[in-house]
Amino acid sequence: MRIEGILTVAPGLHGAARSDASGNVVEAAGQLDAESLCAVAAMCKVPLEAASELLGLGGLRDFSFSYGQGAFYVHHDGGFVCVVGGPSKSPETIMKKIAHAAGDL
């Protein structure tokens, strides 16, 4: 599956990008600032991993941020798959669909 396919896993998704572990964009589709979003994902990784370790949650795989105007989803698999979309009442479900589809990239 190409990165464009990620946008079809749930309604309201409008941009997706794939990057390496440093946040350097490899592929992007849709309406988003891929460079900035992938850089944010890379910068969030270390503090979120530390929080996960302190809480005994295991390794970081996925994370998402929901805000009034939309949501930011990140699947971590050595690199990142970053997706932006509109607000959702079920961000966990969308994150699971993105992670599943990202495994096919």
Identify what each model region corresponds to:
Residues 1-105:
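Non-catalytic interaction/Regulatory regions outside core domains
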